[in-house]
Amino acid sequence: MSKKVSKQKIRISGQNQKLSEKPGLNSYKRYVEFLLILLLVFITYGNSIQNDYNLDDGYVVSLDNANLLTSKGISGIPEILTSKYSEGEGVTYGYRPFGKVTMAIEYSIWQNNPHLSHFVNLLLFAINVYLLLLFFKRIATMFNIENSALVYLPILFYIVHPIHTEVVCSIKNREEILCFSFLLAALLIYFKFNEQKKWWYLVPFLVFTMLAFFSKETAFN
């Protein structure tokens, strides 16, 4: 009798060990996935780090001694949050402060350095791709799709597709990356809310939704 009990304990402990290993394995897998995404992003767009500013970057950074709010650094953030996106002569439109906020923070750290700003764009795009991967995985789980190729191949295609070149390689277009990333984060949190029915999930959901809107108005289109 004691032998049977001991065998059962061994089986239970073995099962518990496997269950305890799963979170660690999942965490390791997530790290590997993100690092692979980061590697592919830098292979595809890494040459943009050597680029200078382009003409459109003048909307978000101080070029040719233009008096822009971002050149005030962190101290200019309150004014950025209460200003239009573009306030030129006869042209005033848009409200998308979050991209400018990131540029103001960067200016406080290293002032105008296009190479580091391009580097930040690549990191943000890698995060964007990883969030999209999590979204695809959630959709695959919802529809019981077990073929991992249907999840990973679209991600690979998304990274290397040339349509993203302008967004990733233009510092001004960081707002597009931020907008989509915050929307993906909001959707992933909504899935959590829909599963667990815990109201407090709605708080980060609303925060990320508003951050997407503050990145670019098209978040609500």
Describe the residue ranges of each PLM region.
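Polytopic membrane enzymes that build or remodel cell-surface glycoconjugates and lipids
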Residues: 2-221
